[in-house]
């Protein structure tokens, strides 16, 4: 009985995450501004991390958690880089001097 509820919960979670990912990808493609695309990319990476987490529960394996961490790091770095590019026009600051 409990296994049936668990299976229904996992399947419904995957369906909801799939619909959320579809909405995020539509906004990523059609987004009128770059900021919309950055936000939708960040949201879609969070949805992908959630899907991988559910798959980790399904397969009863902790090896998927490393990929969740990798997706989170790549998403954070890319969001910060694109936001700096939108704000300043460049990713790296070239106004620093080297100390010798």
UniProtKB/Swiss-Prot annotation:
Belongs to the CPA3 antiporters (TC 2.A.63) subunit F family. GO terms for cellular component: plasma membrane. The chain crosses the membrane at residues 5-25, 38-60, 65-87. It is found in: Cell membrane. This is Putative antiporter subunit mnhF2. It comes from the Bacteria. GO terms for molecular function: sodium:proton antiporter activity. May form a heterooligomeric complex that consists of seven subunits: mnhA2, mnhB2, mnhC2, mnhD2, mnhE2, mnhF2 and mnhG2. The keyword Transmembrane helix applies. Its main location: membrane. It is a multi-pass membrane protein. Keywords: Antiport, Cell membrane, Ion transport, Membrane, Transmembrane, Transmembrane helix, Transport. It comes from Staphylococcus epidermidis (strain ATCC 35984 / DSM 28319 / BCRC 17069 / CCUG 31568 / BM 3577 / RP62A). NCBIfam families: PRK12657.1.
């Amino acid at each position: 009985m409990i296994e049936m509820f668990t299976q229904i919960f996992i399947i419904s979670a995957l369906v909801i995450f799939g619909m959320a990912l579809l909405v995020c990808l539509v906004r990523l493609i059609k987004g009128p501004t770059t900021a919309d695309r950055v936000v939708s990319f960040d949201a879609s990476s969070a949805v992908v991390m959630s899907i991988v987490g559910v798959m980790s529960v399904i397969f009863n394996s902790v090896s998927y958690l490393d990929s969740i961490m990798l997706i989170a790091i790549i998403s954070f770095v890319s969001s910060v880089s694109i936001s700096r590019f939108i704000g300043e026009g460049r990713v790296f600051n070239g106004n620093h001097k080297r100390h010798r």
